[in-house]
C-alpha cells in the first residue's frame, strides 16, 4: 500500500482497522455509498451489522462500548441518516460513552446549497459531541480518524462525529496512518495534586459518619479493584448512582444500595446525616441530589472526578481531587487508616428494615394475584446467578431492575442514565451481546420503550444475536402514569397503551416467544428463556398500577423521600 494511492473511502476502512475496530453498526445511503463499497471488499476483516434504523445503530454501538470497554462505531448517510443518530449521540455524551460516528455528506461544492439530503450535521451535533469535524479532502482522513478515536476514549470518554463529503470519499491520495498520542491544548488526564490526596485522606481518617457515593467513573476508569480496596480498608458504607451499579458486587457487605429519586431509603436519608461525603466518579445529577441547597449541607465533601468541569458545578466540594480515579483512589487508600464504622453502618441496616417492611416485601412477595415487576427481576436473578449483563430501558422497570438485580461482575448494568432515552434497551442489548459474546445478556424493557425501537428484532433475527428480551407489560407508560396518580389526581392523560400482540410480532420475526400471566408460570418461562441458545422474547404481564417506591418528589430534599 506504500506506493499505491487509495480512495478516501478505502482510507476510512484502513483507519478503522488501524484503530482495532472489527465491528461497526450502520445503515447505508447515497452519501456514504463509496465507504459501503469498501466494506464489501473488506468484510473478512470488518463486520458491518445492518440496523433497522440509525437510532438502533448508535444505541447498539453504545451497548457494545459499555460491555466491551472498547470504542463503539456507528455509520450513516447524510440528511435524515445523520439526524437519526443525534438522540444516541446525546445519550452517549451525557453518559460518557466512547463512540465514533461517521456520516456521509453531499459533495463539497454542494455544501450550503440545500442539496438533496444535506443537513448541517456538524452544527446540529456540536452541543452533544465531545468533538466533531467535517472532512472535505481525502488527505485529512488518517489524522482526523486518529484524533477522533483518541478523543473518544481518553479522559472522560464521549462521542465524536466525523462528517465526510462524498467527493472526499472518491479522491485518491497516499495513505499513511499514525495513532494519535496527544493533542496540543487537550489535557485528558489532569495531574493529581498531592495536597488534595493528603487533605482527602485526613478528612477520611477523622470522619465518624462517612458515606461513599460512587458513579460510572469507577467503571470507565477501570478502577474497580482500587475502589474495592479503598472501601474495604476504610470500612465506609458505599452507595451507588444508577450508572455506577455493578462496580462493586451487589452482595458486598459495605454496599448499602442506590441513591437518588427511586433509590434506597437508608443511603438517601443518611446522606443528610453523614459528616463526610466522598463522591467518586459521579456528577451530582439532580436525580441524585434533589434540592441541592439541602443536599449533604452538614457534611464535608470530597469529590474525585477526571473532568474539572464537574467540580463545583452542582455541589461545592471542600476537597476536589481532579484526575484519573484509578490513580487517585490508590494513593488515597495508601494514606487511609483501616477502620470499621459498625455503629454508623447499623443505621443503614435499621433503615433497610423499614424499607423492607413498607416497600420491598410487597414488591417481591406480593399477596395480590397480579405479577409485580420486582418478583420478575428476582426470578431472573435466580436463573442468571448475578452473572448476566442486564440492559434496561427507561421508566419504572428500569428503577425496579436496578433496585433488585443482582450483580457479581462489573460492566453488567447498562442503561440510559442522564438522557433517559426510551427505546435504548433493545438495540443496546444486541450491541452489548456482540461486545461480550461469552456472557448472558438480558434486556428488561417496558411496553412503551419496546415499541420505539421494536424494528431491531429484524437485526437480532438476521444475525441470530442470542439476546434475551423481557417485556414487563403493564399496558401503561408506567412512570408517567405513576406521577399522574401521585401529583395529578389520577388524570391519566395519554398514558394508557393499547398494545399489539408482542408474542405474535416476535414470531413474525421468527423468534422464540411466549407470554406469562400467572405466577405459577413465571419461573418455568424464565428458565426456558435463559437455557435457550437463541434469541428469545418473553412478555410478562404485570400489575397495571404497580408503583415504584421509595420516591423523592422532584426538587424535594433527599430527606423527603416517600415510602408510599
Predicted feature locations:
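Generic enzyme active-site microenvironment
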Residues: 161, 303, 391, 444-445
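Thiamine diphosphate
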Residues: 102, 110, 114-117, 312-314, ...
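N-terminal alpha/beta PP-like core and its mobile active-site loop of ThDP/TPP-dependent enzymes
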Residues: 2-340, 379, 383-386, 466-471, ...
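Active-site nucleophile and cofactor-binding loops and adjacent substrate-binding regions
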Residues: 27-29, 48-59, 74-81, 136-137, ...
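A glycine-rich phosphate-binding loop feature that marks nucleotide/adenosyl-phosphate handling sites
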Residues: 163-168, 395-397, 543
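Active-site diphosphate/adenylate-binding microenvironment
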Residues: 9-22, 30, 35-40, 352-427, ...
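Phosphate/pyrophosphate-binding active-site segments
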Residues: 1-3, 139, 175-177, 202, ...
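Active-site-proximal structural scaffolding
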Residues: 231, 271, 373, 453, ...
Amino acid at each position: 500500500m506504500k506506493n499505491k494511492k487509495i480512495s478516501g473511502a478505502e482510507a476510512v476502512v484502513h483507519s478503522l482497522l488501524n484503530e482495532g475496530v472489527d465491528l461497526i453498526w450502520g445503515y447505508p445511503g447515497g452519501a456514504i455509498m463509496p465507504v459501503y463499497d469498501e466494506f464489501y471488499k473488506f468484510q473478512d476483516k470488518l463486520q458491518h451489522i445492518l440496523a433497522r434504523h440509525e437510532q438502533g445503530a448508535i444505541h447498539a454501538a453504545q451497548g457494545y462500548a459499555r460491555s466491551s470497554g472498547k470504542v463503539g462505531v456507528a455509520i450513516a448517510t447524510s440528511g435524515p441518516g445523520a439526524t437519526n443518530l443525534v438522540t444516541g449521540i446525546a445519550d452517549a455524551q451525557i453518559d460518557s460513552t466512547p463512540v465514533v460516528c461517521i456520516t456521509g455528506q453531499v459533495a463539497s461544492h454542494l455544501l450550503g446549497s440545500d442539496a438533496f439530503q444535506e443537513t448541517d450535521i456538524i452544527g446540529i451535533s456540536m452541543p452533544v459531541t465531545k468533538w466533531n469535524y467535517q472532512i472535505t479532502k481525502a488527505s485529512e482522513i488518517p489524522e482526523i480518524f486518529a484524533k477522533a478515536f483518541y478523543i473518544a476514549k481518553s479522559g472522560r470518554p464521549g462521542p465524536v462525529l466525523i462528517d465526510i463529503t462524498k467527493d472526499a470519499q472518491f479522491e485518491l491520495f497516499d495513505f499513511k496512518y499514525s495513532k494519535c498520542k496527544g493533542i496540543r491544548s487537550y489535557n485528558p488526564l489532569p495531574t493529581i495534586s498531592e495536597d488534595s490526596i493528603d487533605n482527602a485522606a485526613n478528612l477520611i481518617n477523622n470522619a465518624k459518619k462517612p458515606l461513599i457515593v460512587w458513579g460510572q467513573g469507577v467503571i470507565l476508569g477501570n478502577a474497580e479493584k482500587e475502589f474495592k480496596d479503598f472501601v474495604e480498608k476504610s470500612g465506609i458504607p458505599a452507595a451507588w448512582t444508577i450508572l455506577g451499579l455493578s462496580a462493586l458486587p451487589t452482595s458486598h457487605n459495605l454496599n448499602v444500595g442506590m441513591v437518588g429519586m427511586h433509590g434506597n431509603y437508608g443511603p438517601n436519608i443518611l446522606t443528610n446525616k453523614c459528616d463526610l461525603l466522598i463522591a467518586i466518579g459521579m456528577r451530582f445529577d439532580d436525580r441524585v441530589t434533589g434540592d441541592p441547597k439541602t443536599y449533604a449541607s452538614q457534611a464535608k465533601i470530597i469529590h474525585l472526578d477526571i473532568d474539572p468541569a464537574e467540580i463545583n458545578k452542582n455541589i461545592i466540594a471542600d476537597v476536589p481531587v481532579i484526575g484519573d480515579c484509578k490513580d487517585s483512589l490508590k494513593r488515597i487508600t495508601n494514606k487511609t487508616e483501616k477502620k470499621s464504622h459498625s455503629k454508623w453502618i447499623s443505621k443503614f441496616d435499621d433503615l433497610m428494615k423499614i424499607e423492607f417492611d413498607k416497600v420491598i416485601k410487597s414488591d417481591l412477595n406480593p399477596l395480590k394475584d397480579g405479577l409485580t415487576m420486582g418478583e420478575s427481576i428476582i426470578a431472573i436473578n435466580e436463573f442468571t446467578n448475578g452473572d448476566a449483563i442486564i440492559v434496561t430501558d427507561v421508566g419504572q422497570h428500569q428503577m425496579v431492575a436496578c433496585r433488585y438485580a443482582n450483580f457479581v461482575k462489573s460492566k453488567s448494568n447498562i442503561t440510559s442514565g442522564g438522557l433517559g432515552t426510551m427505546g435504548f434497551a433493545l438495540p443496546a442489548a444486541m450491541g452489548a451481546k456482540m461486545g461480550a459474546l461469552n456472557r448472558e445478556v438480558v434486556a428488561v424493557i417496558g411496553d412503551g420503550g419496546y415499541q420505539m425501537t421494536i424494528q431491531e428484532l429484524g437485526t437480532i433475527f438476521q444475525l441470530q444475536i442470542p439476546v434475551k428480551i423481557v417485556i414487563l407489560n403493564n399496558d401503561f407508560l408506567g412512570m408517567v402514569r405513576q406521577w399522574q396518580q401521585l401529583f395529578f389526581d389520577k388524570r391519566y392523560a395519554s398514558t394508557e397503551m393499547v398494545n399489539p400482540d408482542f408474542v405474535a410480532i416476535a414470531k413474525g420475526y421468527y423468534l422464540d416467544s411466549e407470554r406469562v400471566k400467572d405466577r405459577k408460570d413465571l419461573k418455568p418461562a424464565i428458565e426456558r428463556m435463559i437455557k435457550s441458545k437463541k434469541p428469545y422474547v418473553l412478555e410478562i404481564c404485570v400489575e397495571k398500577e404497580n408503583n415504584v417506591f421509595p420516591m423523592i418528589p422532584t426538587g424535594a430534599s433527599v430527606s423527603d423521600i416517600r415510602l408510599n
